[in-house]
Amino acid sequence: MNKYFTCYVVASLFLSGCTVQHNLINETPSQIVQGHNQVIHQYFDEKNTSGVLVIQTDKKINLYGNALSRANTEYVPASTFKMLNALIGLENQKTDINEIFKWKGEKRSFTAWEKDMTLGEAMKLSAVPVYQELARRIGLDLMQKEVKRIGFGNAEIGQQVDNFWLVGPLKVTPIQEVEFVSQLAHTQLPFSEKVQANVKNMLLLEESNGYKIFGKTGWAMDIKPQVGWLTGWVEQPDGKIVAFALNMEMRSEMPASIRNELLMKSLKQLNII
């Protein structure tokens, strides 16, 4: 099976701080470097959690945090898969950016989800039911074909089309996530430019002082230990793209904002924003 992106990292990377090369099908290999930033290590320690922040600039990938081995460990993508779900759905004309997904009055996990919304609004609210509906429209066969075509993570979706990204079997490493989102940021994924532009517009989180921050959160609550994500990119004032994937162990009592707090502090520490 051809993968659009795959990576191989030797264990010594996390022990010695050396650099290695990993292969991207149809791409120039990226250089992976263990970052040396004790302050970011301490940020994760202070939150009593284990985590890694993967940063990609051009073809160089740097790893920061207090659990760098997580960078090449597979985890369920949780709601970060909404990015690919939207790309597949729009590309295959299963929806469009103007469609209103109707709420039928059923109880949902969060009251913020209990309303009609577009795909873009559902992306910002991380409304699982809307993206489950989209996945069902796409269907198991087409979804499997598309996930394999893109080579996202292990590309395994199992037999249930509306929860494989929440509980498995789909899994992806933080390095693979940062590669995926970097290609999206540069409009280099094998989808139409229009579809990629539409999805990128859904992901804008913040804009200030000439910087734009795009991203998607994820929180896998139904697995043990729980996993948190925040994956996206910074568009700097000069147009340069810096992609990131934050991955950490979560606990039920943690505030959802902890991921954004860790990310923003780390990006400032690295002078990315």
From Swiss-Prot:
Alphabetized GO MF terms: hydrolase activity; penicillin binding
UniProt keyword list: Antibiotic resistance, Hydrolase, Periplasm, Plasmid, Signal
Principal EC category: hydrolase
Regulation of protein activity: Inhibited by the desmethyl carbapenem, MA-1-206, via a covalent binding to Ser-79.
Entry similarity comment: Belongs to the class-D beta-lactamase family.
Residues that bind a beta-lactam: 79, 82, 126, 217, 219, 259
Function noted in UniProt: Class D beta-lactamase which confers resistance to the beta-lactam antibiotics, including ampicillin, and carbapenems such as imipenem and meropenem. Acts via hydrolysis of the beta-lactam ring. Has penicillin-, cephalosporin- and carbapenem-hydrolyzing activities, but lacks ceftazidime-hydrolyzing activity.
EC code(s) of this entry: 3.5.2.6
Keyword Iron belongs to the record: no
Subunit structure: Monomer.
Pfam families per record: Transpeptidase
Record GO biological process: cell wall organization; response to antibiotic
Record's protein name: Beta-lactamase OXA-23
Organism: Acinetobacter baumannii
Active site positions: 79
Post-translational note: Carboxylated on the epsilon-amino group of a lysine, with the resulting carbamate functional group serving as a general base. Probably N-carboxylated at Lys-82 at neutral pH in vivo and undergoes complete N-decarboxylation, at pH 4.1, in vitro.
Keyword presence, Cell division: no
Entry GO terms, CC: periplasmic space; plasma membrane
Record-listed N6-carboxylysine modification sites: 82
InterPro entries referenced in this protein's UniProt entry, alphabetically: Bact_Transpept/Beta-Lactamase, Beta-lactam/transpept-like, PCN-bd_Tpept
